């Protein structure tokens, strides 16, 4: 059985795959050989994916009527993949469908929209990154958006969260793997003069665009009214989501927030030296052992034990008992691209 992946130099690495390598080398090996869990549905993640789907269409100029129709088709595709989770998927589709139009209304009238110059939306990058040993790894990913503000590039990060915590997100930024990985890639695009990125010569920082998920605790966490003596029919599904939309519309600042965090070149340098370069050098050496059997690198391969590995997964059923139930074969390691 051959791996789907041709290694970090030929096929490149995304921050998502790098995170899997960091978490457990053996489970990562199973992943690159095309094995994935069948039952890995995550409602929070899927809501974020629904929101991202809407953002991508909206940034391309689509009207809400088209976005809404496309969102429904997208939700149906998720339900086809996870039929046992259809009620959850329908619920979060309805939440997204009532929240996103209020989001559009809110930011259309906000001055923040006027001062930025949109530069790139949903930009897929594949940029060579030279390591100290001379090897060139391909950094891969997709920017949500990059804008020009006051003559600098600002990376936009869209986040769906149960709570909007300005302090926590800003505090962890300098060692946030996804954001800093993207900033490294952005700087490489600029420095290498890859079109169209040579127009601006500095990075201003990160612009957070945070959306609070309703029905996740706090304001907006409501329940559908049950039938009563005075209202035998109770509250219909449409009435419930209309009420939720009204709560969001009456207090949009509790559900939508944007702010900037400035970054200087030394912050990116620090992330590269303390994390990215060491882990990518290890990844390249580890791959030489996995793909070519280079024995001097065999001790870079290990299985992370329980306790550090958060849960028992379908991978562990295979590793512990040889049971392949719950695993499926995949053909693409980069579905997000």
Where do the model's predicted regions map?
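RecB-family 4Fe-4S metal-dependent nuclease core
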Residues: 1-337
């Amino acid at each position: 059985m051959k791996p789907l992946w041709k290694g970090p130099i030929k096929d490149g690495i995304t921050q998502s795959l790098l995170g899997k390598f960091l978490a457990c080398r053996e489970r990562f090996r199973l992943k690159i050989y095309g094995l994935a869990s069948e039952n890995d549905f995550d409602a929070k993640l899927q809501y974020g994916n629904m929101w991202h789907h809407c953002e991508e269409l909206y940034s391309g100029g689509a009207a809400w009527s088209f976005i809404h129709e496309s969102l429904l088709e997208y939700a149906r595709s998720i339900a086809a993949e996870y039929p046992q989770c259809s009620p959850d998927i329908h619920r979060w589709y309805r939440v997204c469908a009532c929240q996103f139009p209020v989001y559009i209304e809110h930011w259309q009238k906000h001055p923040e929209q006027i001062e930025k110059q949109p530069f790139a939306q949903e930009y897929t990058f594949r940029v060579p990154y030279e390591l100290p040993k001379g090897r060139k790894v391909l950094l891969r990913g997709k920017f949500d958006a990059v804008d020009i503000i006051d003559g600098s590039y600002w990376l936009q990060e869209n986040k769906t969260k149960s709570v909007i915590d300005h302090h926590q997100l800003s505090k962890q930024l300098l060692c946030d793997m996804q954001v800093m990985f993207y900033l490294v890639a952005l700087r490489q695009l600029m420095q290498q003069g890859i079109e169209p990125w040579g127009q601006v010569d500095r990075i201003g920082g990160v612009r957070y665009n945070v959306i609070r998920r309703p029905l996740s605790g706090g304001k907006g966490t409501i329940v559908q009214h049950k039938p009563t003596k005075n209202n035998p029919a109770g509250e219909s599904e449409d009435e419930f989501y209309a009420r939720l939309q009204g709560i969001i519309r009456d207090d949009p600042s509790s559900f939508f927030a944007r702010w900037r965090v400035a970054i200087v070149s030394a912050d990116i340098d620090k992330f590269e030296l303390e994390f990215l370069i060491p882990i990518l050098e290890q990844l390249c050496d580890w791959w030489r052992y996995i793909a070519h059997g280079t024995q001097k690198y065999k001790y870079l391969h290990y299985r992370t034990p329980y306790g550090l590995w958060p849960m028992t997964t379908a991978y562990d059923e295979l590793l512990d008992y040889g049971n392949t139930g719950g695993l499926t074969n995949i053909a693409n390691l980069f579905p997000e691209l």
